Amino acid sequence: ARAAARHYADQRIKVAKPVVEMDGDEMTRIIWQFIKEKLILPHVDVQLKYFDLGLPNRDQTNDQVTIDSALATQKYSVAVKCATITPDEARVEEFKLKKMWKSPNGTIRNILGGTVFREPIICKNIPRLVPGWTKPITIGRHAHGDQYKATDFVVDRAGTFKIVFTPKDGSSAKQWEVYNFPAGGVGMGMYNTDESISGFAHSCFQYAIQKKWPLYMSTKNTILKAYDGRFKDIFQEIFEKHYKTDFDKYKIWYEHRLIDDMVAQVLKSSGGFVWACKNYDGDVQSDILAQGFGSLGLMTSVLVCPDGKTIEAEAAHGTVTRHYREHQKGRPTSTNPIASIFAWTRGLEHRGKLDGNQDLIRFAQTLEKVCVETVESGAMTKDLAGCIHGLSNVKLNEHFLNTSDFLDTIKSNLDRALGRQ
């Protein structure tokens, strides 16, 4: 048995450079552990730079652990992240926190920059609200500025609303009259920067090239001629200068679209493209996409930095608190681990691409295929069975498996696919 174990250890795929691992909270933390111990480490010999982003440890380290994990990601280029709690008042009370810590994803994104791409995992037997979407559609949301950093206010009487720009170089100020209020109303001033728009553009082009999918970018430049026009111009300029050759090589394309045309086109399409959205559009449309594809349990999320080299992969869903409460009472749950598994596979696949490690890429792709084929063979968790039969009609072990049985099924299917049985 020892010889067999040693031979098994020798068979593991060697990974030259480390991967940053960010642990999380509640039900996803429990599933994360299983994925790592049972699906990843038996097959992959990788050095994991471990950071515990579970809420108790964030509180204990005054959130320094989150900052450290982001800096480590800058250093090693690849991170995989478990879902984490973003505390509200109730959580501050529950965990007796020193303060209401900010969203770890926000902190990490502020340090790394980059764009979040949400991509659905498609299983043929899971019905979609938009049945025509047979290929994935990925949204890249520009998570900076616009309405989210705006200054807005209520006007309570007649008066003039002006915007003033005062140049730093001492040249004369410019001002624009926005509106002459005859009575009360509302006003807003917002901004974005060339640097942020350029970083967004690079991330989107890089991601489209990785996927070998066409890229569309949507704005309302007919109405916001200067503001949205700037987005359009920067994207076009960067595309022609840096990416056109690669796009031509892979027979993919980049096009700007008006947001209203784009929304209609997306609904009619069969998928298979990347959609670059401004901040507000991305916020709204990514939820439409998640719903249209059927399940947040089948949605991955990847933060891609403008250098095209640095990424952080995670599931697009939360920590599944409701299931965790059941788990704490000692009851079995049926929690979907697929998006968390894909966080690992996306991270490892990227590590493989950076290191030129074909075996690692093949392993990641095999595990993804095994997940999809397992569901397509009829073995699945309750959320997916509910998509097919309706949640009120599904029965344990007839239509769905509990979490550990489903993970065990994936494990044995993976071992079989890798010829390890």
Curated annotation (Swiss-Prot):
Keywords: Acetylation, Glyoxylate bypass, Magnesium, Manganese, Metal-binding, Mitochondrion, NADP, Oxidoreductase, Transit peptide, Tricarboxylic acid cycle. Mn(2+) binds at residues 260, 283. GO terms for biological process: 2-oxoglutarate metabolic process; glyoxylate cycle; isocitrate metabolic process; NADP metabolic process; tricarboxylic acid cycle. Acetylation at Lys-382 dramatically reduces catalytic activity. Deacetylated by SIRT3. PROSITE patterns: IDH_IMDH (PS00470). Binds 1 Mg(2+) or Mn(2+) ion per subunit. The keyword Hydrolase does not apply. Its cofactor is Mg(2+); Mn(2+). Signal peptide: none annotated. D-threo-isocitrate binds at residues 86, 103-109, 118, 141. SUPFAM superfamilies: Isocitrate/Isopropylmalate dehydrogenase-like. Residues 1-8 form a transit peptide. GO terms for cellular component: mitochondrion. InterPro entries: IsoCit/isopropylmalate_DH_CS (IPR019818), Isocitrate_DH_NADP (IPR004790), IsoPropMal-DH-like_dom (IPR024084). Its main location: mitochondrion. Plays a role in intermediary metabolism and energy production. It may tightly associate or interact with the pyruvate dehydrogenase complex. This is Isocitrate dehydrogenase [NADP], mitochondrial.
